């Protein structure tokens, strides 16, 4: 069977593919059309110098560039990013980011070439200190009701439009202190989805201390690290955290929750950031 792929007419982040389905062990009589997620090489350039190439969903790339710049410590504040330009290429997308001269000088001292696989986040990191880099401790804030976290996670599931179409993407959502989902970003890579969300928060001037981040994936240490770098004090994941994620959360004053499903959750760090009982 010939495999035919072409972009879906209404979206850039998914495409149509011909598929021969098997149901109950029986092969279908004819091919059907299926929607699949796009996965595109996205190269980030800072002040004209190539810095990282990741595989990502080709949507919300301005959010991604700003969020990546913040969570990776390339810039300290959104104002350090002077401009973002999306430049499509025949074999991918180049995102040209202009940053302040002070940030550019600092970046040169810690430059690394990261060739990522679906937002793996570590490919090309040259030294252990670059992996476990220091990030600020998140400031204390008023406790958020645990019921709001549970409500937010349920609400996020109904807001994953790209996942509903393709079944192939992760989501990162921002919910306020009452569990109302305000923003959702999706990507084939869970780190990319989180970076897009952080960038969207920054572009909309939303205080990261005023709510929580919910993710449809496991919680790796990089996810905790990125939240701490953005000043986000609560990270709730639908799946498990890693041991290193828990240690990073403990050290950065981040409340880390795993297995947040329906009315269940496991709280691994800083339960004082949550109001556990009505």
UniProtKB/Swiss-Prot annotation:
Q: Which HAMAP family match?
A: FdhD
Traced from the root, the source organism's taxonomic lineage reads: Bacteria, Pseudomonadati, Pseudomonadota, Betaproteobacteria, Burkholderiales
Which cell locations does it reside in?
A: Cytoplasm
Q: Where is the active site?
A: 120 (cysteine persulfide intermediate)
This protein's GO cellular component annotations are: cytoplasm
MF terms from GO for this chain are: sulfur carrier activity; sulfurtransferase activity
Give the originating organism: Bordetella petrii (strain ATCC BAA-461 / DSM 12804 / CCUG 43448)
Protein name, per record: Sulfur carrier protein FdhD
Chain segments annotated as transmembrane: none
| Single GO BP term | Mo-molybdopterin cofactor biosynthetic process
Can you tell me which family this protein belongs to? Belongs to the FdhD family.
Keywords (alphabetical) are: Cytoplasm, Molybdenum cofactor biosynthesis
Summary of the function given for this chain in its UniProt record: Required for formate dehydrogenase (FDH) activity. Acts as a sulfur carrier protein that transfers sulfur from IscS to the molybdenum cofactor prior to its insertion into FDH.
Matches recorded under InterPro entries: Cytidine_deaminase-like, FdhD
